[in-house]
Amino acid sequence: MDAEADIPYGTLDLTVLKTLDVMGSLHGYGIGRRIEQVAEGSLALNQGTIYPALLRLEQKGWITSKWGASENNRRARFYEITRAGKKQLAAETESWQRTVAIVTRLLEHEP
């Protein structure tokens, strides 16, 4: 993808959980930047999207947060994936892989 696109519907939780699983503790801005970096700039993830998702994931018990200092010594909330979050990540990854396989078969099918 050359142009920026919004993150595909239904993948935000998956990408946030995966980012925290790989990177460890990160603040919200760092999570968003890391997702954009891995997507090589092809996804746009605005802060109005990431913070409600982080709150929702924390309420579900899939992540935890604590206050700390960012790289520029500003106060920031840092997030970490929980054991329940790792289980959810595994389930969502499996579901996403099944969905991709089905859509791929449908797109490649010729009568």
Summary of predicted features, one role per range:
Residues M1-G10, E92:
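Intrinsically disordered, low-complexity serine/threonine- and proline-rich regulatory segments
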